[in-house]
């Protein structure tokens, strides 16, 4: 692991280093589901199971489920025989449950439910899901299936503008994704920790490149080319900070040794659409370990990191092409983050 160091003298430290491809050789690829059409021209519902990580607890039966479907009009007169108009595609995250039911039974029961879809707004545009129908195999997910759920529209809907307000809409499920949670540890980093900033600290970030079996340009993603000439997309996530006392920064070599000793292993899952799972097999500093919640199995959902890129992976195969450690100065606390901007009638920008 060799770092290329920035030539910018204003940066106290900045370096990029690639991890070995062996760190994601097991679990670095998610295959897409090939669609099948029945004699009526409708897509046959399917399921797929993903088992990222080291599978330390193979029989704990905890799983994360997310289903995908067509948002279509609800016909007022079903006997008309007219085909329902498909508006867009949406993801319906069900969350974590513990079940010993066969995946096919889970899928069939999901498809038997009546799932309604409604567009609304809060701080952002929202999608509201509601469902009705008898539950047997899906009892571990009873709370979300009977109580309803609401999500940021950009995270779960491909084209929210196509969801009609004047007509009732329903979700016709065609795919169920099951991620087995067979490793001990947490499956989400607290958002407050992801936004944690510290003076005189070095931020430890990961830059992940993905090969996606899709036309990136058509999806509005420019991307870049890897060493084989294949177009790839990338996203960045934050793991923690290397903090030194007395107002000093750690050196590049020190951080390099710390990262090497962690022996990180990467794999892909389907939590929230696409998720990056990280396992720490080696030694980690106490401070960094505390920032990670004292867990050695971590998960980052692309739904939260980059929802636009996440939507592109819904029905396309995806593979890790490259993972790089990025060391950057942590953004100082003095830097203001403006979530809201107000402009008065004189054109002056006011602090939110």
UniProtKB/Swiss-Prot annotation:
Keywords: Host cytoplasm, Host nucleus, Host-virus interaction, Viral matrix protein, Virion. It is found in: Virion; Host cytoplasm; Host nucleus. InterPro entries: Matrix_C (IPR042539), Matrix_N (IPR042540), Matrix_Paramyxo_C (IPR055413), Matrix_Paramyxo_N (IPR000982). GO terms for biological process: virion assembly. One of its GO terms (cellular component) is host cell cytoplasm. Pfam families: Matrix_Paramyxo_C, Matrix_Paramyxo_N. Residues 1-20 are annotated as: Disordered. One of its GO terms (molecular function) is structural constituent of virion. The keyword Cytoplasm does not apply. It comes from the Viruses. Homomultimer. Interacts with host ANP32B; this interaction promotes M nuclear localization. Plays a crucial role in virion assembly and budding. Forms a shell at the inner face of the plasma membrane. Belongs to the morbillivirus/respirovirus/rubulavirus M protein family. This is Matrix protein.
């Amino acid at each position: 692991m060799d770092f290329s160091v920035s030539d910018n003298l204003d940066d106290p430290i900045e370096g990029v280093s690639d991890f070995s491809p062996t760190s994601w050789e097991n679990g670095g690829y998610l295959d897409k589901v090939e669609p099948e059409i029945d004699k009526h021209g409708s897509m046959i519902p399917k399921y797929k199971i993903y088992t990222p990580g080291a599978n330390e607890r193979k029989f704990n039966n905890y799983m994360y489920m997310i289903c995908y479907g067509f948002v279509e009009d609800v016909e007022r007169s079903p006997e008309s025989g007219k085909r329902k108009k498909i508006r867009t595609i949406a993801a319906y995250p069900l969350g974590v449950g513990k079940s010993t039911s066969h995946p096919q039974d889970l899928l069939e029961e999901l498809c038997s439910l009546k799932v309604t879809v409604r567009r609304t707004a809060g701080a952002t545009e929202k999608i509201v899901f509601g469902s009705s129908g008898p539950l047997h195999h899906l009892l571990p997910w009873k709370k979300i299936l009977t109580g309803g759920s609401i999500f940021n529209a950009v995270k779960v809907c491909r084209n929210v503008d196509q969801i009609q307000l004047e007509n009732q809409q329903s979700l016709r499920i065609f795919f169920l994704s099951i991620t087995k949670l067979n490793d001990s540890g947490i499956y989400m980093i607290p958002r407050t920790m992801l936004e944690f900033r510290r003076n005189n600290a070095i931020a430890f970030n990961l830059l992940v490149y993905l090969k996606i079996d899709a036309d990136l340009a058509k999806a509005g993603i420019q991307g870049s080319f890897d060493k084989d000439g294949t177009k790839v997309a990338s996203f960045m996530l934050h793991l923690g900070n290397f903090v030194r006392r007395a107002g000093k920064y750690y050196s590049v070599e020190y951080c390099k040794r710390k990262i090497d000793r962690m022996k990180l292993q990467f794999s892909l899952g389907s939590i929230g659409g696409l998720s990056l799972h990280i396992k720490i097999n080696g030694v980690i500093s106490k401070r960094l370990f505390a920032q990670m919640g004292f867990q050695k199995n971590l998960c980052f959902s692309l739904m939260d990191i980059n929802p636009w890129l996440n939507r592109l992976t819904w029905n396309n195969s995806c593979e890790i092409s490259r993972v790089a450690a990025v060391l950057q100065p942590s953004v100082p606390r003095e830097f203001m983050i403006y979530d809201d901007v107000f402009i008065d009638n004189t054109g002056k920008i006011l602090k939110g």
